[in-house]
A protein has these predicted regions:
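Class I (Rossmann-like) S-adenosyl-L-methionine-dependent methyltransferase catalytic domain
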Residues: 1-40, 54-155
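Conserved acidic residues
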Residues: 43
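A conserved beta-strand element that flanks and buttresses the S-adenosyl-L-methionine
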Residues: 46
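Short catalytic micro-motifs in class I SAM-dependent methyltransferases
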Residues: 49-53
Length: 155
């Protein structure tokens, strides 16, 4: 189940899944900080670059909602931009997260197994110059500093 606040994004994801023959993929329009109806349903929850996009004051509701949706023993993975991922002069950027900030936010809801350095492979955002020495993958995407947290829900 994919959850997004935007009906346009939900429609696009639904169409893309249908084009790929993914008949068991579903997408719903809901606020990720307060969704209900999935209590104990998911054995794996993966947050790929959402956490750092939320307003800091929305994190508690988000984590409470996904913890409620987690089955006993569920695995939870979070990929976030690390502090320093964007140039200091960048005007528009997501909230970069320190390892400790990530741990402090998640620990009341899940048992943290590991937080490790990672990269987010990204196209250079419009209007955001990439440092000339920035590492890139074989497709030319920027390798932006990140953290990957893995955790689990206690029974």
């Amino acid at each position: 189940v994919g959850i997004d606040l935007s009906p346009t994004a939900v429609a696009a994801a639904t169409e893309a899944a249908a084009e790929r023959g993914l008949s068991n993929a579903t997408f719903v329009c809901a606020d990720i900080t307060s969704f209900t109806g999935y209590d104990g349903r998911f054995g794996t929850i993966f947050d790929s670059t959402l956490f750092h996009s939320l307003p800091v004051e929305g994190r508690e509701g988000y984590l409470r909602s996904i913890r409620r949706a987690a089955a006993p023993g569920a695995r939870y993975y979070v990929l976030v931009f690390a502090t320093g991922a964007f140039p200091p002069e960048a005007e528009a950027k997501p909230h970069e997260v320190s390892e400790q900030e990530l741990r402090d936010a998640v620990a009341p809801y899940f048992t943290i197994n590991d937080v490790r350095p990672a990269y987010i492979h990204a196209n250079s955002p419009e209007g955001m110059p990439a440092p000339p020495d920035a590492p890139r993958d074989d497709q030319g995407r920027l390798l932006m500093p990140a953290f990957l947290l893995s955790a689990h829900a206690e029974n």
